[in-house]
Amino acid sequence: MLEISFIPAFKDNYIWLLTRGKRAFVVDPGDAAPVLARLEAGGLMLEGILITHHHADHQGGVAELKARWQAEVYAPGNESITGCSCPLSGGESIDVLGQKVTVMAVPGHTLGHLAYYAPGALLCGDTLFGAGCGRLFEGTPAQMSASLDSIAALPGDTLIYCAHEYTEMNLRFALAVEPNNQALQARVAKVAALRAAGLPSVPLILAEEKATNPFLRCHEAAVVEAGLQHAASCLLGHAAQQGADIEDRSKTAIFAAIRSWRNTF
């Protein structure tokens, strides 16, 4: 089995380090310096780099790392990625230190966003966060909703390795959506204790996300009603002018309403 550990970067980024013995891959190295320090401290040899999407805080360190090690760079083929040697589009299987890893297309945050799945673990970049999901900078609500559905279909004990420590703020929003969700209330207390102790809230557990993350619960009655209320209170005038249906209860419509609410929360 691969060992997975985090390398903190910037204010709240996690660069994921995958190791087997002294061999290593890194995921989304936005900054080379902390990666170089960890590799050198552990006597590790970098063999590959996995990139989920093109944003600078996820690929900014690639050139420097590739100059030090001639590592393969696996990345979305339809995005501009420094040094990409293995362009991917989703659906491929790649070998990561002897572990078969499935490449998943998860558009939404960006159009070419990828996630990397091996049994028990998903490296998802900025698609899913603790109690939240990524902003839709390029994709549509329908695309992101479908991407989240593909993640939700994985086994419940899957550990989710996302790229940012956003859980506490996301939980505050989730409580605004579902104030009576007891699992959510318990998670708020648990995460607060972790963060107070200086510990990360990740990796996430998929089953817990499905019980507490509003973006994975757009089919639940409480989330549907909260989404409709937000649409009615914030979008009524515009919707009426445009002839839009603010009573649309489809999962995509509710996701769009909840995501819009989160953007201004």
From Swiss-Prot:
Zn(2+) 2 binds at D57, H58, D126, H164. It comes from the Bacteria. Pathway: Secondary metabolite metabolism; methylglyoxal degradation; (R)-lactate from methylglyoxal: step 2/2. Monomer. Belongs to the metallo-beta-lactamase superfamily. Glyoxalase II family. Its EC number is 3.1.2.6. Zn(2+) 1 binds at H53, H55, H109, D126. One of its GO terms (molecular function) is hydroxyacylglutathione hydrolase activity. NCBIfam families: GSH_gloB. Its cofactor is Zn(2+). It catalyses: an S-(2-hydroxyacyl)glutathione + H2O = a 2-hydroxy carboxylate + glutathione + H(+). GO terms for biological process: methylglyoxal catabolic process to D-lactate via S-lactoyl-glutathione. InterPro entries: Clx_II_MBL (IPR035680), Glyoxalase_II_hydrolase (IPR050110), HAGH_C (IPR032282), Hydroxyacylglutathione_Hdrlase (IPR017782), Metallo-B-lactamas (IPR001279), RibonucZ/Hydroxyglut_hydro (IPR036866). This is Hydroxyacylglutathione hydrolase. Thiolesterase that catalyzes the hydrolysis of S-D-lactoyl-glutathione to form glutathione and D-lactic acid. The keyword Glycosyltransferase does not apply.
